[in-house]
Structure formats: structure tokens, C-alpha cells
């Protein structure tokens, strides 16, 4: 009991702390465009910048557009909710202005806590609300199968959102969960891998219970919402909330998915490696979470009606006594379809293990709901207090650290739920374990530590969700007690086996039992008359088959055969190869742990059958009693009792200590379970790193193997090349040896030919370069021509546009002139009309005056007429009176009338009154006159009337004309104004057009100036290029001429070489004969030496004898020289045969000079032309011919015929015998093909003798084209140069004895490119050569160009056609002598490309040389 009391207190404290963690509703009502709050009400724009107090509010800047979806009603009508891009939140109404209204009729509904979630920028993972889902499914099962589709279709239509929604939401949640699991690895904190598992729970708990500063006014509402107060609502209210939360949830889920994408982008930026490392595992686990997250969001329906703080709160919180919430939960249970849809979408990454566990657990909990058992909450509370909350506190602390470090990603919308927070935590813990089970499938070697805790905690927590909700199930759903116990036992056992044995273990049969038992239970319960059971079957029975069969299919391949027997079998086709080994290890380990902890699960099964309702009543009754006692004890001094809740303090302390140690134990176990998984992240990282390194290593090895193969191939090729090169070298050496044996001089000639060939190649390469330059220049010229054409076309276009503008200008000018003319005409017409109007005004005024006068005259005439009428009347009256008088007087009528008339006339006239009779007559006469005058007056009156009528008509006409003129004037004025406006417009247009024209003209002028400058630059470049082209063409022509000359010279040298070869063959024969003679002489000398030695010994003996006895031997002295000996005369005065055989004539001094073979007199060695017989008979300075020199017995044979190499010859000829000079007359016959020069100039093919070249007889058929081409060029000067020179004796005289030839350099350097065909070497007086010691050993600088006639060599790269004269023209040596080439140093003074100009020496003294 002490333990129970301690648990009661701790449970109460925890429930109170959870009560205080509720969120605040900003308003109770809201207005939306539709029931789901997904319709866009209006679009607004921000009038000012706004920053909200927390993350529930939307931050924006001025001018941004916001889409409004929700408007709060009631107290906070000033707040609207909308989205800006991917951000969603509340903002004040006065900060925005409406731009466009989409929905005018708004729907008012109640708000939920999920509308005011605040995520604070951290990743929020929607966990699976298994506790309430499983606990309440018992109420939400439809009893009839025919209602199943109808009811489920309602919710399917609510949740079948666009396909892109689940794709984004699924990927977002997958990737959001991965970094949540991986966050500690990247944070780098000391508890790196410890936090790895704990961050998930913390992020879930932190999101569900955000740390919001709740004012006291919101505490009660928070308590209501957390404890589910007001659970006993009427069915109408529940049905109202059926549709609203569903639609709200779809909208909120869409918003949360958008928020998750923002967090995902941050995640991808911050933790790309860890996300990649655990992507597959996190996606496997994220599917059930995604399902429950969508479901849990719609479950958070606020219940504003409350029935008391403790009673309703704890009944809703703890899950008993609330029997009217079944209809409310229809809306909450409408989200399980969402649990299936993401499953079906993310099928390729989802494992069967968690699905199976969830399904079996759900079936078991449904069955347990239908069982009216009495499980005790002791073990449940013990588990919460010992494991979940201790671990939660620890995780909360760690997560706060992670939040401070910014390492953990959380979403910005924590879901508030009316479920129990402890249940949520336990569900989260279950999800953590599932996640760990799925993520940690690969590394299994170190998971033995968690084998004790994971099965225990899993089974304990899976079955723990039910006892809180046992009382929610109506009594008619309860099954018979024995059947229920059996089913639950089977389900628990089978659940464990299905949970921990997945693969080929013997537990496959038990896994089949899991499905069979769970489905049998679910089918059994589905027949009970509850409204949502079929709903659960619609979405949970297919979730085991459809999610795994049709969509997910991710589980182990070996599970298939065991599940084929069932129609709802789980297939796995996508991740077979990936998960077989890991699932085998996991199932084996879990199977062992299951066997070890079987007894614990039996105890747990018993503990879960204890009545929670009675125990909770017993738990809360002491609390009530305690409050009553405290109230009663307050007036008495507030002394504590001797016991606590009716228990002794000893028991209470013991229970507290035991509970404390139990908490520590479970914390320790949880810590060990967490620590047991620390290696997972590291191992995955290391595995990824290792795999990457292995891949890199394999790539590097492949590259290395390829490079090694290439290197080996290259080595093989190089070895082959080296072998071939060695072979060629050996062959060349052998050939050289043979050639040396045969004739060393041929190799020298071939070397000279090679030099010439190289020079020819260089010339040809230069020629090709020049051709390339020409081609480039032509291309450039072409491109420049194209550019010039394009520029010309552009200029033409510009000119055309300019002309068009000019034409337009002329047209505009003409139009302006026409408009001005029209304007002037209109002005003139206006003036005329104004003048006419003035004239008409004057006429009208005159007519008005006339009218006035006529009216006055008319009035006067009318007065006169009136007067006359009155007078006539009076006259008639008087006449009548007169008639009356006549009747009275009795007189005649006529007399009376006459009398009357007369009287009247008299009375009128006042003349005849005194005579009455005459007056009567006069009166009558006067009356007749009056009648006549009256008639005339009447005629005048009629005329006046006619005139007046005419005047009236004219007046009317004039008035009409005036009116017409006025209208015409008005119209003309309007036209005038119109024309004036048009004139102004035209003037404005003219100004604008002139400005535009000027601007265009300026632009065109600028363009033209730029183009002109560009054209000038191009022309300058073209001129420069033309000059370069002209220079290049000139150089090309010179090169061609020189190439032709070289070809001709080459041909001539070839012909000369052929003649020299013949002569050398003859020389070789002569040298052989001389060698034989020398050998005979040598033998003679040896014999003579032997004889002399013998004589010497004899004389020494005689001398000794004579010393002993002077008179002992008296022998006559014979001739010591033995001239008459059989061996012939002694040649002691001559050089030894070795030296004598290779001594060269004095012309050897001229050897290093090696003048051109084209020199007169055989080119220094003889005539170049082999067909000239006179060249073979050239005499030396003593007049000896070459034929005579062949028979000279005292002269050593020529070195050119010797079989020894030339450097041997030179070395042996360096020191002649003492007192012995080179006899000029004893030179061997001269072959006219050998020549040599030390001048450094190109003086014939003899310059190339130091290079190895095949003999000329071999080259006849395979001669290079360069040599063949140069052969023709060398033929030109043969006729002029093969003439014997008369200056040879003097020149040869200058080359007298006393000169010692220098040692020969083994390799000749690059030759100074000089054309040797020029005749300038034949001119000039003979002069003595320099001293012998420095002539051949010195470099070419020894003879500076200024010391000798001829221009100095100029260092430019072009070869001249004529040879330069940078060195003295040494005279040709005596015929038959072929000196060795000089040192390479003397040859390499100038590069081969530098040619001193020698145009002057070519024509300086040719005739005197020929004459001499």
C-alpha cells in the first residue's frame, strides 16, 4: 500500500505539472472559407514591417503579399492567419491591406489548440497516438459490413489529398526524422551518441508541450484541454466536430508539411552527412509516425464544455467514465486512412516489423478494450515513473542543451492533444524503440545489453495503452471472460514473437498466430454494434495486407512463406537483399531475449488485468480525504498526523525509497538501453566512411593499375625503342667500323651531306613555316576582308538608314509645310470670315437702322392714315348732315350737296363761307378731290404695306443669315481651335521628331566615327599585314632561290663526292700499296735493328774486351750503317714506318680550313668536277704533278688512303721526326674530291664529315629529296669552279713545311650556314698562314672578321645566296691531302641560322682570281 500511496502522489504531481503545460488559445472562434480552412479567403499586402512576439506569428516586411486562410473571431478579431511562401502564422489586421477578396461568405467555427502551435524553429516529429487510437477504436467500430464502405468513403474523401501532398509530406517527415535521430552526432557534444536516441523523445515531447508562457487566465482552459474536460458533450456537438477537425487537419497537415520543408532545407544545409547516413533507416521508421502524426492532428479537438476539474478531467485524462465520447472520436478516428496512405506511398522504405507490431498491438488493445478486465495501473505507473518520465526528464535536459546549441531540428507546430501526456510519452518511447529496432538492424554485435530492457519495455508499454481506456467501451462489446483472457494471452505472446522474430526462426508459426489471433479477434469484435469498429477494420486490417502487399512490401523475404497461408500475408519484394541478414540477427537476438523475459511478461499480463477504475477511485479518495483533513486541521495548529494517508511513516519512507530506487533502476536500464545503441551511429558513420574509402581505394587501384599498364606498355615501347636504338647504334657502329676499315673519309663526307640535308630540312621547315605564316596571313587577310565587307555592309546599312531618315525628314518637312500652309490658309479664311462677319454685322446694323426708320415711317404713315380716316369720317358725317339739311331746307339734293361741299370747303379753307351756294358746289368738288386723294392714299398705303412686308421678309432673311453666320463663325472658331491644337501637336511632334532625328543622327554619327576609326585601324592593320606579306613573299622568294641554290650545290657536291669516292678508292689502293711497302720497310728495319742489336752486343763485348785488354781484339771496323747489307740501306734518317705511313704533306695545315670544293684548282683539294682530267694533273708549287707524286719513294703516302681513322692519323702526324719536315714534293696524288675548311662557313659537303652517314654509293638510290633538289642547284657553278687555278703554286708555297696538324675533334659542331659556291675565295693575294700552334686549336674568334678582307658576319637569320667572307680565304692545300675536321668549338661559334652578308665578296675580285 505504501508503494501505491507513493505512486498516487507522484501521479498527482505529474498530472498537475502536465496540466500547467497546456497551451493557450488565442481565440475560441475562427472564420474560414470552408470547413477545412483550406480555401483562400483573400490576399493582402503588408503596409508595414511586422515581427511577432513568438513563432505563432508571421513575420513580414512592407510590400509582401500574404494569403489569408483564417480570421479569428470573438475576442481577437484583429488577428488573421495566413501564409507567406512556406511560412504560416498570425498577424494583426491593421498591418495589412486587402488587395483581392476570393471568398465573401465566411464560416465560423471553434478553434483548436492545433491552430496555435508554436515550434520555435525546431523539428517537430508527429508521433503515433497509439494510446488513444487503440483505446478508442473499441467505440468506433461499425457493426455492419454494408456501412463500412459508406462510412469509410466519407473519411477517405476527406483525406485523399493531392498526390503531391503525401509525397512532400512523406519526404519531409522522413528527412525531418532522420536529423532528429542524427542530431547529436553532428552537434558534437560530449553525450554525442547518448543523445542520439533521446533527442527524438524530447523533440516529440517538446513539440507536444511547448514551453509557452501561459498567463493565469489560460491555465484553466489548458487544464481542460489537457485533461479533456467537457467530455460528456451532446451528440450534436460531437457530430459538428466530426467534419471540422477532419477538414482542419487536412489544412493543418498541409501547412505543417510546408513548414517541414523549411526545416528540411535547414536540415539539409546543416546535416547532410548524417542525413545521408541514416536516410534509409529513418524512412523505414517514419512511415508509421507520419500516419499517426496526421491522425493525431485531427484528434486534437477542443472540448470547451467542462464538467469539473477533477472528475471530468481525470476521467478524460485517465480514460474511464467517458462513455459519450464515441461520436466525438469518429472525427478523431477519421485519420487512420492517413496512416495507410503514407504507408502505401513510402512502401519501398518501410519495414514489416513495426507494422506488424502496431497491427497486433492495435488488435490486442481493441480486444482488451472489449474485455472488461481489471488490470492494475501499478506496473503501468511504475513503468511511467521509472522509465518514461525519468528518461523524459533526462531527454528534456539533453534536448534543451541541443536547442541551445542549435543542433536539433524541430518543427514549428507542436501538436496539442487531449490524450494523456504519459501515454504520448510512452507511445513516443515505443516509437523510439521501433526506430531503434529498425535503424539498428545492421549492427547487432553490441546489442546484447538492450536485450533485457527492450522486450520488457516494449511489451509493457504496448499493453499499457489499454488500461486507461478500458472503461470507454460499452458493456455490450465485452466478450466472455475466459475467451478474452485466452485471446489476450495469445495475442501478447504472439505479439512478442511477431515483434522479435521476423525471419526464418521457428517463430514464423507464431507470427502466423499473431495475424490469425488478431484477425479473429478483430473479426469477432467487428460484429458488435459500435459505430467505428468497421472503420478501424477498413484502415487497420488492410494496413497489414494492403500496406505491405500493394505498397510497402519492405519486410524480409523469408517471412513470406509463413504468411502465404493467410489472405492478408505480408510480402516483401524490395528490401529482401538488404534486410535478410540484419533481420536474422535481430530476430535471433529478440528471440533469445523473449525466452529470457517470458516470466516477466506473464507477470505483466496478470498486472494488466487488474481493475484500473477501482484502483483509481482508491487512488483519488485519499486525496479528497487529505484535503478534508488539511481543511479540518488548519484551525487546530496545523500539526501533521502520525501517519500519511492512513499509512505509517515507516511504510511511506520505505515506499519512497523503493520507488526512488525503482526510478533509479529504470533510469539506469534506460541509460543502458540508450548506451547500447551508441555504437550505431558511429558504426554507420564508420561504415559509410569505410565504404567511401574502399570505393576511393578501388578507384585509385583501378587508376593505378591503368597507369601501371600504361607505364608497362610505355616501358615495353621504350625498351623496344631502346633495343631498336641499340641495334641501330650497334649497326651504325659496325657500319662505322667497316667504313673506318674501308675508308674514314667517306664517313666525313656523309656527315657533311647530313649537315647539308639538315640544313635543307631546316630550310624546308622554315619554308613550311613561311607557308603556314602565309596561310595564316591569307586567313587573316580573308577575315579582315570579311570584316571590311561586314563594315562596308554596315556602313551601307547606316547610309541607307541615314537616307531613310533624310527621306523621312523631307517628308516631315513637306508635311509640316503643308500643315503650315493649311494653317495660314485657315487663318486667312478665318480672317476673311471675320471680315465678312463684320460686314454682315454692319449690314445688319444698317438694316436694323432701316427697320427702325421704316417702323418710324410706318408709324407716321399709320398716324396720317388715321388722321385721314378720321377726316374722312368727319367729312362723311358732315355730308350726311348736309343731306339732312337739304331735306330740311327742301332744296335740291344736289344743290344741298354742293352747298355742303362748298360749306365744308369753305369751312376748311375759310374762304367761301360767306357764299353758301358756291360753297356747296365747292364742297362737292372738294369731296371728289378728297375721294381721289383717299384712293391715292390707299394705294400708297398698300405700297407701304407691301414694302413693310418685304422689309420684314428681308429682316427675317437677314436674321436667318446672321444666325447662319454666327453658327458658321462658331464652327469656324471650333475648327480654328482644332486646327490650332493640331498645329501645336504637329509642332510638338516636329520638335520630338527633330530631337529623335538629332539623337539618331548623333548615334549614327558616333557609330560612323567608331566604325570609321575601326575601319582605319583595320586598314592600318591591313597595310601592316600587306607589308608583312610583301616581306614574307620576298623572304619566301629568297628562300626559294636559296633552296634552289642549295639543291644545285647539293647536286654538285654529290657529283663531286662521287668523283671523290672514285679517287678515294684509288687512293685506298695506293695507300694499300704504300702500306705494303711500309711493311716491307718495317720488316727490313726490324731485321736491321736485330742485326744492329747483334752488332751492338758484339761491339759491347768487344769494347769490354778492349777495356780489359786493348790489344785483345784487333778486328777491322766494318761499315756501321750497313748500307750494303742484304736488307738495303738503313732508313734511320727517315721517319719510322708507322709515322711515315700517315704523315701528311704540308698542305695538312690547310686541312681545318677545308675550303669549298668549288674553289679553283680543285677547291683546295682538287677540282670538283670528276670529268675534268686536268684537275688530276694539278702541279704544286714545285711543279710536281699528282702523277709524279705517286712514285715518290721517299714520301709517305697520303693519309686519306690510310685504313686508320683520321684522328689516329692526326695524332700520329702531330709530331714529325726531329729534323724532318714535310716534303712538298713527296705528296701522294691528289684526289680532287676531298676538301675541308675551318672557316666555319658552309664550304661544301666536307663540313659534314663528322656525322655518320651511309656512303654515297648507297645513297644513290635512296637520296633524300632535299639532296636531289639541291643537286640541281649545285650544277650551276661546276663549269666555273672546276678550272685549275694558277695561284695554286704560290698558295701551296705558303703552306710549306713546319705546320703540325691539330688533333681532330670527334664530333663537329653546327656549321655556319654559308653558301660555298661563290668565287670570292679564289681572289686576294696569297699570304702566309698563322702560326701552327694556334691555327687549328684556336676558335674562330682567333681570326676576327676585321682582320681579313670582306664584310664581317651579320647576325641575322636569313641565309644569303652568296657566301660571306668573315674569314680569310685560305689557299687550297696541295692536291691529294684531305685534312681532318677541326674542333667542334670552332664550328659552333655561330648558330646555323646566322649568315654574315657576303654580297660584296661575291662580285669583288672574281676576274683577277680567274686570271691568276
Curated annotation (Swiss-Prot):
User: Start and end of every SH3 domain?
Assistant: 39-101
Family in the record:
Belongs to the MIA/OTOR family.
A cellular-component GO term for this protein: endoplasmic reticulum membrane
Q: Which stretches are transmembrane?
A: 647-667
Tell me which Gene Ontology terms the entry assigns under biological process. endoplasmic reticulum to Golgi vesicle-mediated transport; lipoprotein transport; protein exit from endoplasmic reticulum; protein localization to endoplasmic reticulum exit site; protein secretion; vesicle cargo loading
Check the record and name the PANTHER family matching this protein.
MELANOMA INHIBITORY ACTIVITY PROTEIN 2, MELANOMA INHIBITORY ACTIVITY-RELATED
- What disease is this protein tied to? Autoantibodies against MIA2 are present in several cancer types, including benign meningioma and cutaneous T-cell lymphoma (CTCL).
Coiled-coil segments on the chain, per record: 725-850, 948-1102
Known glycosylation sites: 59, 368
InterPro entries per the UniProt record, alphabetical: cTAGE_MIA/OTOR, MIA2_SH3, SH3-like_dom_sf, SH3_domain
Record's comment describing the protein's domains: The proline-rich domain (PRD) contains repeated PPP motifs. A single PPP motif is necessary and sufficient to mediate interaction with the COPII coat subunits SEC23A and SEC23B. The coiled coil domains mediate interaction with MIA3. The first coiled coil domain mediates interaction with PREB.
Q: Where is the signal peptide?
A: 1-19
The stretches that face the Cytoplasmic side, renumbered to this chain, are 668-1412
Q: Where is this region: Proline-rich domain (PRD)?
A: 1259-1412
Q: What is this protein called?
A: Melanoma inhibitory activity protein 2
Tissue expression, per UniProt?
Highly expressed in liver and weakly in testis. Expression was higher in patients with severe fibrosis or inflammation and chronic hepatitis. Isoform 1 is specifically expressed in lung, testis, small intestine, colon, pancreas, kidney, liver and prostate. Isoform 8 is expressed only in testis (at the protein level). Isoform 8 (at protein level) and isoform 9 are expressed in cutaneous T-cell lymphoma (CTCL) cell lines, colorectal carcinomas, breast carcinomas and melanoma. Isoform 9, but not isoform 5A, is expressed in head and neck squamous cell carcinoma.
Q: Where is this region: Mediates interaction with MIA3?
A: 669-1258
Q: Where is the segment annotated Disordered?
A: 260-308, 401-424, 540-562, 1153-1304, 1316-1412
Q: Where is the composition biased (Pro residues)?
A: 1346-1355, 1365-1383
- Bias-annotated ranges (Basic and acidic residues): 540-552, 1178-1197, 1268-1278, 1402-1412
Q: Where in the cell is it found?
A: Endoplasmic reticulum membrane
